[in-house]
Amino acid sequence: MEQSHQNLQSQFFIEHILQILPHRYPMLLVDRIIELQANKKIAAYKNITFNEDVFNGHFPNKPIFPGVLIVEGMAQSGGFLAFTSLWGFDPEIAKTKIVYFMTIDKVKFRIPVTPGDRLEYHLEVLKHKGMIWQVGGTAQVDGKVVAEAELKAMIAERE
């Protein structure tokens, strides 16, 4: 049953995120939700450390966090926003749902992200109908836009 959950808490820590998102190490790219307004927007972040496996090959002498993983972190944040907007914070329902990417549009990478950065995701709902959600926004470090994108996803039943 689709409904709106306007009374959600605005911050979620890693133990909450793990109960809603199915991603796990090394693909969980959200450490904390710092702002959430159901059906409207989300702000979240990931702390980038030199211990990330990806830096073994991207690039050995000049570590740069891959742009595709920045977009994936934005998508995970958008998925958390969509799920909690529909069902609130409900780990039992989360076990039965999964969010799939449909499209990625208007992607731009502006500044490299490196170890020591706090990568913030800022996304707004552009539109949604039923289980289809379109979000857009930016990834930022120290208030500077490092990437931007529009993403469309659908929420489906897990098999």
Swiss-Prot record:
Pfam families: FabA (PF07977). GO terms for biological process: fatty acid biosynthetic process; lipid A biosynthetic process. Involved in unsaturated fatty acids biosynthesis. Catalyzes the dehydration of short chain beta-hydroxyacyl-ACPs and long chain saturated and unsaturated beta-hydroxyacyl-ACPs. Its main location: cytoplasm. Its EC number is 4.2.1.59. This is 3-hydroxyacyl-[acyl-carrier-protein] dehydratase FabZ. The lineage of its organism: Bacteria, Pseudomonadati, Campylobacterota, Epsilonproteobacteria, Campylobacterales. The active site is at 58. It catalyses: a (3R)-hydroxyacyl-[ACP] = a (2E)-enoyl-[ACP] + H2O. It is an enzyme of class 4 (lyase). Keywords: Cytoplasm, Lipid A biosynthesis, Lipid biosynthesis, Lipid metabolism, Lyase.
